[in-house]
Amino acid sequence: MSQTPNNLATYIWSLADLLRGDFKQSQYGRVILPFTLLRRLEGVLEESKETVLAEYTKIQAMNLPEEAQEKMLLRTTNNLSFFNVSKMDLSKLGEAGIKDNLESYIQGFSKDAREIFEYFKFAEFIGQLNDADLLYKIVQKVRRTDLSPKAISNHDMGLVFEELIRRFAEGSNETAGEHFTPRDIVRL
């Protein structure tokens, strides 16, 4: 598959095939968009992950408030505005305990990134996916998609998000022009 933004969006949107029957069409975007964002964030953080984890171990021993820890950790992220302190990634979640592992992984993100997942009510959908025995399947498909900056530029990734949001809006029966990229996603 050629990784043009449209082809990539089509591939990502094919997650909807797994959701059919267990989720309403209007809910597909509430699952697909945060998983896409999660995979992109994971790819962006790949280069600084080990440095952040090493620094986090040192900072934890200081018993500082979360805000102070975040300020210190942001210095180790290669000028990124977010980080993740979990040793997990999508490839390490495993099938047993995947719900708890994924929730823990998301809690490892810095506050601003976590707020985006909260906006999507992602924890609720993780539970529903787990109850429907779809969580592992979705994670496996998402993790096979390379959304790192080496594979797809920030501009093209923006186009992918726009296309996914457009499809989500169509599935939600919204009228044209009512969908947009949340500013938090653009800023990240």
Model-inferred region functions:
Residues M1-L188:
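Non-catalytic, mostly N-terminal accessory regions of nucleic-acid modification and defense proteins
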